[in-house]
Curated annotation (Swiss-Prot):
One of its GO terms (molecular function) is phosphatidylinositol-4-phosphate binding. It comes from the Eukaryota. The PX domain mediates specific binding to membranes enriched in phosphatidylinositol 3-phosphate (PtdIns(P3)). A 1,2-diacyl-sn-glycero-3-phospho-(1D-myo-inositol-3-phosphate) binds at R38, S40, K61, R74. Keywords: Acetylation, Cytoplasmic vesicle, Lipid-binding, Membrane, Phosphoprotein, Protein transport, Transport. InterPro entries: PX_dom, PX_dom_sf, Sorting_nexin_PX-domain. Residues 1-125 form the PX domain. It is a peripheral membrane protein. This is Sorting nexin-24. PANTHER family: SORTING NEXIN-22 AND 24, SORTING NEXIN-24. The lineage of its organism: Eukaryota, Metazoa, Chordata, Craniata, Vertebrata. May be involved in several stages of intracellular trafficking.
Length: 169
């Protein structure tokens, strides 16, 4: 799993003063998705993670400082924090995966120490779904044959499909 925070933006709200939203890019198993979180959500995650695993330091919250340089330092610090949690823990807690909107892997022992799958999800929803994958290493019709003998079956089928208007050899 790879995690980056490529950007942030300022949100204005009628009910409260504005806040900053950090855009988190999550790359896992060849798939990429984005999650947006406020600093307060990072801080809440940190408090919960400290009870389950050894955590790195989280960047401090500056007193309503909207200076772009300070926000950029916080973005870098939060990115480093997420990457350190991943690097320092062989198995990631369920609440960390929830934070990143990553589908749970049912065989993570440390995940259960932070909350069991049975508490929040049914057995059906926590199962991994099967995603068939097709892999073509190369086109067998373009690559040279492994032996010097022609494959008469393949030649016959290809001739019949693509050259049916021609007479046989």
């Amino acid at each position: 799993m790879e995690v980056y925070i490529p950007s942030f933006r300022h949100e204005d709200s009628d009910l409260e003063r504005g806040y900053t939203v950090f855009k988190i890019e999550v790359l896992m198993n060849g798939r990429k998705h984005f999650v947006e979180k406020r600093y307060s959500e990072f801080h809440a995650l940190h408090k919960k993670l400290k009870k389950c695993i050894k955590t790195p330091e989280i960047p401090s919250k500056h007193v309503r400082n909207w200076v772009p340089k300070v926000l950029e330092q916080r973005r870098q610090g939060l990115e480093t924090y997420l990457q350190a949690v991943i690097l320092e823990n062989e198995e990631l807690p369920k609440l960390f995966l929830d934070f990143l909107n990553v589908r749970h892997l049912p065989s993570l022992p440390k995940a259960e120490s932070c909350g069991s799958f049975d508490e929040t999800e049914s057995e059906e929803s926590s199962k991994l779904s099967h995603q068939p994958v097709l892999l073509f290493l190369g086109d067998p019709y373009v690559l040279p044959a492994a032996s010097d003998f022609p494959n008469v079956v393949i030649e016959g089928v290809l001739h019949g499909i693509f050259f049916s208007h021609l007479q046989p050899r």
